[in-house]
Amino acid sequence: MLKHELWFEYILSELIPSVQEKMNNYDKWMVTGASLGATHAANLIFRFPKQFDTLLALSGIYDTELFYGDYHDENTYHNNPCAYMKNISLDHPYMELYKQSKLIFCVGQGNWEQECVESLRQFSTILYDQHIEAWCDFWGYDVYHDWPWWKVQLQYFMEQIFK
C-alpha cells in the first residue's frame, strides 16, 4: 500500500503540476479507466476532488475489500471507495465538490462483469444515500469485460461529456 500512496503522490505533486505548466494552468482534470483502472480513477476523484472534476469509470470494482483479504489498515480503508464514501459526513467540505463533478460509471452485464455489476450497484446506492448525483449505466447482457466494449463505451461517453 505504501507504493500505491507514492503513486498518488507522484500524480498530485509531479505529473499534474508538470502538465499544468505546459497547458496554461488548467485547474481540474478528468480521470478515466477500465477494470482496475476504473477502480483507481474512482478512488482518485473521491479522495482528491480538488484536483479532479470528471470521472469515467468502466467496469470497476468499488468495494476493494476483496483485494486485501483479512488485512485492514488506514491505507486499505482510504483505498476502498465504498468504505470511505459510506462514512463521509454530509457536511464534509468535499461533498460540494462531488456534487459539482461529472461522475459516470458504466458496466456491461455479460461475461466476466458480475462482480463489477454487484460492486456498481452497491456503490450507486452509497452515492444516492449521500445525495451525490452519478450516471450509473448498466449495459446489456452481451456487453462483456474486455477492450472491444470499453472502446465503444469510451467513445459514447466522451461524446456525452464534451457536448
What role is predicted for each listed range?
Residues 1-163:
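Non-catalytic cap/lid and distal C-terminal segments of serine-dependent acyl enzymes
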